[in-house]
Amino acid sequence: MGKVVILTDSSSGIHQAEAQQLGISVLPMPFFINGETLFEDINLTQDTFYEHLTDGAEISTSMPAVGDLTDRWDELLKEYDEIVYIPLSSGLSSSCETATALSSDEEYEGKVFVVNNQRISVTQKQSVFDAIRLAESGKSGKEIKDILEDAKFQSSIYIMVDTLYYLKKGGRITPAAAALGTLLKLKPVLQIQGEKLDAFAKARTVKQAKSIMIKAVKDDYASRFKECQDEMQLCIAYTGDISAAMEFHKEVEAEFGITDIDRKSTRLNSSH
């Protein structure tokens, strides 16, 4: 059995130091801030990113450059026989589709396996952990890809949006909808199950939005994930406000009776 390495991008929330500890590779996502290209966790720190965000900087994101991706593949294939690449969901970025096309080139075919399992942030990170475990158990790159894709709908993400500004800026809602939502002081709750980011519910307060998310997860536990509750992982991702995240963490622990909930900050989501 050949040596298999796991590669993901920084939208998984895995930083370079953690990647080194895990024995994997992480491709940094590019951010364009006031016309300058910066790379997450390379020359863009978390503190600097949120300073730019607070100051109203022009921020956008992009998929990793093709050259950067193939250079990383070439580098890894000098040491490993196969690469399992777990990029950002194909429903939210074209990076997965581009990588899949590149992996069919003669020099990468049968060596690079691109996983299209519709994950982002904490669910993408869990896919990385699953891939590591599968590789350690002796699975091939293709076997890991197939297993992860077979389980692509076994996840749910619920997101509370405190401001509609970035959804409007990114073109995910119309200016009119953003203006109306702001006027009514709405706190949308969004959902990711599979490919797309969809509206799930509307709340008037942060407290109500948090209650909606907790109930939604409980409903998923009782229905969609009823047969695999013992294997489920519960995670919290947040943007910027660590004190609010810690408060919500305690609420979720109390509701579910779980004390090993993972909590991570995510920059990619903040810019959208």
Task: Name what the model sees in each region.
Residues K3, S11-S25, P30, E82, ...:
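Mixed-charge interfacial surface used for oligomerization/domain docking
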Residues V5-M63, D68:
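N-terminal glycine-rich anion-binding loop in soluble enzyme alpha/beta folds
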Residues L7-T8, P87-S89, V115-N116:
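Short beta-strand segments
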Residues N34, N43, N116-N117, N269:
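Detector for Asparagine
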Residues L44-Y50, W73, K78, T100-D105:
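A short glycine/small-residue-enriched secondary-structure motif
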Residues E51-A57, W73-D74, I132-L134, V161:
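A general structural signal for short secondary-structure boundary/capping elements
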Residues G56-S90, E97-T98, K145:
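Glycine-rich phosphate- or other oxyanion-binding loops that anchor nucleotides, phosphorylated ligands
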